[in-house]
Amino acid sequence: EEHKLKVAEAFLDDVGKGYARMDADDMIKMRVAPGDVVLITGRRSTVARAVQAPPSHCGQYLIMMDGNTRNNAQAGVDELVSVKKVPFKAANSVLLSPVQANQGVPTDEEIPHIRQLLQGLPVTIGDNLQITFLGARPRSYTVDGTNPRGAVLISSDTAIAFRAPEISAERAFRVSYEDIGGLDRE
């Protein structure tokens, strides 16, 4: 059963975990148990794991999500989203590509670390993920494919593959004044 809930910011401890915190009463109405996967639809649909909100956040028809989940749902704080329980499967494999064209593909040595960071995360094709490597800035990747299709949960057994970003001709040849040194007095 689909419900409309108002988007709120996630707790700091929930950032990057793919959680959607909701009032226990709202979860009961949707027949959602903690740990279930829910489909969240703003201007786009994404998936997250249902987690119970503390009593202080109850009775307000809120869904607490981190910035990445809000971006994937294309919904801002205080906007209404549709939420419903969806079936999910363990991901056999996930194909990711870097969001930035100049960002390389991780090495084979980095993939086990990435799998560990993404373990337990629900994803669907088209989602963007933030992966923070040790001591480095977060890197953004797009989910280009999943096996099976639909809502999947990344596990320790999920094969994670990367493909290089495709650079469009338009993007490859866009040059700015800064690229050529700007305009100085000659």
Where do the language-model regions lie?
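Beta-strand/loop-dominated core regions that host nucleotide or nucleotide-derived cofactor-binding catalytic loops
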Residues: E1-S176
